[in-house]
Swiss-Prot record:
Its cofactor is Mg(2+); Zn(2+). One of its GO terms (cellular component) is DNA-directed RNA polymerase complex. It catalyses: RNA(n) + a ribonucleoside 5'-triphosphate = RNA(n+1) + diphosphate. Belongs to the RNA polymerase beta' chain family. Keywords: DNA-directed RNA polymerase, Magnesium, Metal-binding, Nucleotidyltransferase, Transcription, Transferase, Zinc. It comes from the Bacteria. This is DNA-directed RNA polymerase subunit beta'. Its EC number is 2.7.7.6.
Length: 1201
């Protein structure tokens, strides 16, 4: 077998007739498949054993030679070679066609490659190929021209007139002759000459022809090979025929298509032998052409060939295309052995790195390991008896199983895998039942809940796979979210509620002001009912094992609550004692105001103090992030487990319930509604008098009701008891938000109708009172819209992720430093006056491009190429610096990837990024994964002429596909001062800008809102009106970097508006991929074709060579491609073909004789090679492992890694 990891590239091209014959093991002459009585393949048929190999291993067809000892013998009776039956998957056959046939891909594709080579229109080609017209192949000395079309009548007239003085033909034969006569060298030179003077359409056509001619010249393909003389027959096991239980056969569609070809071919041969009339022969040739077309790409021309029930048959092209095609179904995703799936249930007592595997499942998954161990222990004599023991489930196998799975991690995956945390490794523990147990804290990462979700289990087999699973994928390692570097394993629901309840403070609770000597005493008092969890007490600070207290504080009393004492036991000893949810307390120390001298009157002191807020979900997240920063992975995962256990325990103790009595209605609600009704009445009066338009009336009514709802909500919050269970649930962040509560106890407010327009009739009732029939009906629209939106959004978001992954899959960290001298100058991203993304967030984890100094003291804050940590970022912002130049993926010089310095910190680990990290895929997942959280709506914003601004998912798609945005802003092409804004015709406004050497005027539609006024100084490319800028226009007016910065800011605005944080670097990686191509305008003295789309690196390389040799370099202009287009324009044809438009990509690649250098991930997955990322990268593959010494017994627990 071919070693998959041993070849460097893959090449595709056209096959010559001789090449096809050389692949073949024999000619298929008959359309028969299998004899229905003997069930043996027919000789010379589509399943013939003589051509394709034996049906049974080591056995010829007639049974004369059986067993492996006759290996390689060809039977003298039936002619079948004695070998493995597996060869029926690889041996090909062929059909000698009685007449040449054109290949539909090259004739029918857009543009028609055959048409370009022959300089004929596809219409004319179709007429020739399908025998409607003659074409002159050799005009001789007649006035006819070569390639001139003649109708049947004209042909007869000219034949009588000139006799044999010219030759003309029809069908693929004539095409083949013309193609064979083409002199590529001469045609190419003629076209180059033509290009010098040609303009418009002629120039475009010449460039396209030249591209195809050059492709044929450089690839060594012969244009006449686009016409087939010999048709390859694919191996029979790939188009199988199987017997069903009723004695009938099920067969692949390809066999039907092949049978049609063979039948027609044989009939044509017979007609030719008989010397049939020309018209009959031509008809048969046309039918043969159509049969081959249907085999290669059914349905591409005319009506598709259908099978039973009018179903179009699946041809060779369909086998490759789409989600069910060969590429996406079998090559990019395969079903694997050693895997299983089951329903998940919660495992609250598991450790962070554990999962519960059902016994039966574990036994099946680890079967070979168990069998080996049974034999090794002498519990079974051989593998067979071990297998029988397992099938009988003998009692002794369970101990063995437990031994086998110890320290053998398994991978758990939940579909859809939206980001890399969708697959994590756990150490299995055996559990009874049939459900997988999952640790509650990893649910957020998987987006899993226990309402019937299922998960898949995979077993890593090799030692390397196990080591990678343990070191890189263990759930305890995946604490940070790759998209923003924040902890992803934050507690949720019950755990949040428990910790919130635990840290509550209550005035005058039982035992308030009691002084305790240590924690144990306080806990004892609590267990015996002398104090409550919420009681504020004093405890001797020296008894608390916290290393952050000063010596003076150790001799004082600490004012705290019993609950907070218990809460702080879960934190590391050297972490500050947390008494209040503030940044100061978390990061620096416990505030001094909580320490009092032992002589103080504690009760009076406590009574004078205000109550402190309990610890909500966000604070718990901050605590986890701080612990991670200071103590790293091991300590954090242990602390998380303690936090989880404590949360569950206390929320059980708290016994939160929701009763109808907890929903208290508001007294003032009635009068607020009355007031609103009056205001609406006044607005309607103004409208009736014609003082305002209907649109204005609508907007104002909506505003009134929204204000009424907000007022009710505000009063509700104030009237609520802090210990109300519903309030506690939403305040802690466990579940629900304040608007849910408003709907229960206040009013439901305004609803949208099916079109998304807000109905101006508000729902004034709440759920506590109940809705009227009309109100209920109005609210059903919103409910239904919510559900349909979610369903549509999921599909859209998934498709977006797929396109993003495809365009960035080959971006990998390739080197330590690319040595670039360029950088990106960044400042806080703003929308008007509001800061969308502050500067320190953008700086953290990046490398500085220039030395950063304090503007006043001139002291160095960070040197060039220093990593900017959180502390340095804060220092920079505190120094009043507003913009900083950093290293960025935009300006990185690395080919096919990014370097470590330009990328910066790996957000998923919080450390420097490693060479080999697949940052492209991480970026795509980070942008795609929150896609489902974005809204689908196009907001209708206020004002009469309110433009629809696209937001949410549609806006993200618009940006990444580089489409013309909705509500487009008008941009200026000159920089300078706005000298006048005047009203022109049709109430349009005319803005005039005076540049340094140019004056421009722009007509602005009446409805647009201006962003400038007279006297404003504008730069080139700046927007004059509100709305989104078209990036394609921006790239024309300004430079690439401005476009990159604009796209980055726009993406961040959409996500931040929805409260989703994404690291800048992910967007940078994606945007860089959209701008990696250049369109050649002037070719200079290089041999590049004009109008070619080239990779910037290849272009620069070609120009460098030109300059070194002293010739004229080419010039080009950067092009912004949408992600779909960029994916299809990639250098790798395997990656592009497996993405979309498979036949077009393959046609193009075959003619150009393309080489795929296998640089990206997809190409290598398709070929079954190790991906060139992570540990599959060259520098890691060359490492050799050696045994230093054997360990006697592994005593370390897994958490001590």
């Amino acid at each position: 077998m071919l070693d998959v990891n041993n070849f460097e590239y893959m090449k595709i091209g056209l096959a010559s007739p001789d090449k096809i014959r050389s692949w073949s093991h024999g000619e298929v002459k008959k359309p028969e498949t299998i004899n229905y009585r003997t069930l043996k393949p027919e000789r010379d048929g589509l399943f013939c054993e003589r051509i394709f190999g034996p049906m049974k291993d080591w056995e010829c067809s007639c049974g004369k030679y059986k067993r492996v000892r006759y290996k390689g013998v060809v039977c003298d009776r039936c002619g079948v070679e004695v070998t493995k039956s597996k060869v029926r998957r690889e041996r090909m056959g062929h059909i000698e066609l009685a007449a040449p046939v054109s290949h539909i891909w090259y004739f029918k594709g857009i543009p028609s490659r055959m048409g370009l080579v022959m300089d004929m229109s596809p219409r004319a080609l179709e007429e020739i190929i399908y025998f409607a017209s003659y074409v002159v192949t050799e005009p001789g000395d007649t006035p006819l021209e070569k390639k001139q079309l003649l109708s049947e009548r004209e042909y007869r007239v000219y034949r009588e007139k000139y006799g044999k003085g010219f030759s003309a033909g029809m069908g693929a034969e004539a095409i083949k002759k013309i193609l064979a006569d083409i002199d590529l060298e001469k045609e190419t030179n003629d076209l180059k000459e033509e290009l010098k003077s040609a303009q418009g359409q002629r120039r475009t056509r010449a460039i396209r022809r030249l591209e195809v001619m050059e492709a044929f010249r450089n690839s060594g393909n012969n244009p006449s090979w686009m016409v087939l003389d010999v048709l390859p027959v694919i191996p029979p096991e790939i188009r199988p025929m199987v017997q069903l239980e009723g004695g009938r056969f099920a067969t692949s569609d390809l066999n039907d298509l092949y049978r049609r070809v063979i039948n027609r071919n044989n009939r044509l041969k017979r007609l030719l032998d008989l010397g049939a009339p020309n018209i009959i022969v031509q008809n048969e040739k046309r039918m043969l052409q159509e049969a081959v077309d249907a085999l290669i790409d059914n349905g591409r021309r005319g009506r598709p060939v259908t099978g039973p029930g009018n179903r179009p048959l699946k041809s060779l092209s369909h086998m490759l295309k789409g989600k069910q095609g060969r590429f996406r179904q079998n090559l990019l995703g395969k079903r694997v052995d050693y895997s299983g799936r089951s329903v998940i249930v919660v495992g609250p007592n598991l450790k962070m790195y554990q999962c519960g595997l059902p016994k039966e499942m574990a036994l099946e998954l680890f079967k070979p390991f168990v069998m080996k161990e049974l034999v090794g222990r002498g519990l079974a004599h051989n593998i067979k008896s071990a297998k029988r023991k397992i099938e009988r489930m003998a009692p002794e196998i369970w101990d063995v199983l437990e031994e086998v799975i110890r320290e053998h991690p398994v991978l758990l995956n939940r579909a859809p895998t939206l980001h890399r945390l969708g697959i994590q490794a756990f150490e299995p523990t055996l559990v009874e039942g049939r459900a997988i147990r999952l640790h509650p804290l990893v649910c957020t990462a998987y987006n899993a809940d226990f309402d019937g979700d299922q998960m898949a289990v995979h077993v890593p087999l090799s030692a390397e796979a196990q080591a990678e699973a343990r070191i890189l994928m263990l759930a305890a390692q995946n604490i940070l979210n790759p998209k923003d570097g924040k902890p992803v394993v934050t507690p949720s629901q019950d755990m949040v509620l428990g910790n919130y309840y635990l840290t509550l403070e209550r005035e005058k609770a039982v035992g308030e002001g009691t002084i305790f000597k240590d924690i144990n005493e306080a806990q004892l008092a609590y267990q015996n009912g002398y104090v409550h969890l919420h009681s504020r007490i004093a405890v001797f600070a020296g008894s608390i094992p916290n290393e952050r207290f000063t010596d003076e504080q150790r001799n004082q009393l600490l004012i705290t609550t019993v609950g907070k004492l218990i809460f702080n036991t879960i934190l590391p000893k050297s972490f500050p004692y947390i008494n209040e949810p503030t940044k100061f307390n978390l990061e620096i120390e416990t505030p001094a105001k909580y320490f009092v001298d032992t002589t103080t009157d504690v009760r009076a002191h406590i009574a004078a103090q205000e109550l402190i807020d309990p610890f909500k979900k966000k604070i718990l997240g901050n605590i986890i992030a701080e612990v991670f920063k200071k103590f790293h992975i091991t300590e954090t995962s242990k602390m998380l487990d303690r936090m989880k256990d404590l949360g569950f325990k206390i929320s059980t103790k708290a016994g939160m319930t929701v009763g109808i009595a907890d929903i208290l209605t508001l007294e003032e609600k009635h009068e607020i509604l009355e007031k609103a009704h009056d205001t609406v009445e006044k607005i309607t009066k103004s409208f009736r008098r014609g003082l305002i338009t209907d649109d204005e009336r609508y907007e104002r009514v909506i505003a009134v009701w929204n204000a009424a709802k907000d007022e009710i909500q505000g009063k509700l919050i104030l009237s609520l008891d802090r210990l109300n269970p519903i309030f506690m649930m939403q305040d802690s962040g466990a579940r629900g938000n304040i608007s849910n509560f408003t709907q229960l106890a206040g009013m439901r407010g305004l609803m949208a109708d099916p079109s998304g327009r807000i109905v101006e009739l508000p729902i004034t009732s709440n759920f506590r009172e109940g809705l009227t029939v009309l109100e209920y009906f109005i609210s059903t629209h919103g409910a239904r819209k919510g559900l349909t939106d979610t369903a549509l959004k999921t599909a859209d978001s998934g498709y977006l992720t797929r396109r993003l992954v495809d365009v960035a899959q080959d971006v990998i960290i390739r080197e330590d430093d690319c040595g670039t001298d360029r950088g990106l100058t960044i400042k806080a991203i703003r929308e008007g006056t509001e800061i969308i993304e502050p500067l320190e967030e953008r700086l953290e984890g990046r490398y500085s491009r220039k030395t950063i100094r304090h503007p006043e003291t001139k002291e160095v804050i960070a040197r060039e190429n220093d990593l900017i940590t959180e502390a340095i970022a804060t220092q920079i912002v505190d120094a009043g610096i507003e913009e900083v130049t950093i290293r960025s993926a935009f300006t990185c010089n690395t080919k096919h990837g990014v370097c470590k310095k330009c990328y910066g910190k790996n957000l998923a680990t919080g450390t420097e990024v490693e060479v080999g990290e697949a940052v492209g895929i991480i970026a795509a997942q980070s942008i795609g994964e929150p896609g489902t959280q974005l809204t689908m709506r196009t907001f209708h914003t206020g004002g009469v002429a309110g433009d629809d601004i696209t937001q949410g998912l549609p806006r993200i798609q618009e940006i990444f596909e580089a489409r013309n945005p909705k509500g487009q802003a008008i941009i200026t092409e000159v920089g300078g001062e706005v000298v006048s804004i005047e009203e022109g015709r049709d109430r349009q406004q005319e803005i005039t800008i005076q540049g340094t050497d140019d004056r421009r005027s722009y007509n602005i539609p009446y409805t647009a809102r201006l962003r400038v006024e007279e006297g404003t100084i504008v730069e080139r490319g700046e927007a004059l009106t509100e709305g989104s800028v078209d990036p394609k226009a921006l790239i024309r007016v300004r430079d690439v970097l401005s476009v990159q910065e604009y796209l980055l800011a726009e993406v961040q605005k959409v996500y931040r508006m929805q409260g989703v944080e994404i690291g800048d670097k992910h967007v940078e990686v994606m945007v860089r991929q959209m701008l990696r191509k250049i369109r050649v305008m002037d070719t200079g003295d290089t041999n590049i074709l004009p109008g070619t789309l080239m990779d910037i690196h290849t272009f620069t390389e070609a120009n460098r060579e030109a300059i070194l040799s002293g010739s004229q370099p080419a010039t080009g202009r950067p092009v912004l491609l949408g992600i779909t287009k960029a994916s299809l324009e990639t250098d790798s044809f395997l990656s592009a073909a497996s993405f979309q438009e498979t036949t077009r990509v393959l046609t193009d690649a075959a003619i150009k004789g393309k080489r795929d250098e296998l640089l990206g991930l997809k190409e290598n997955v398709i070929l079954g090679k190790l991906v060139p990322a992570g540990t599959g990268i060259g520098r890691y593959r060359k490492l050799k492992s050696e045994v230093i010494k054997e360990t006697a017994e592994v005593t370390d627990e897994i958490t001590n890694i």
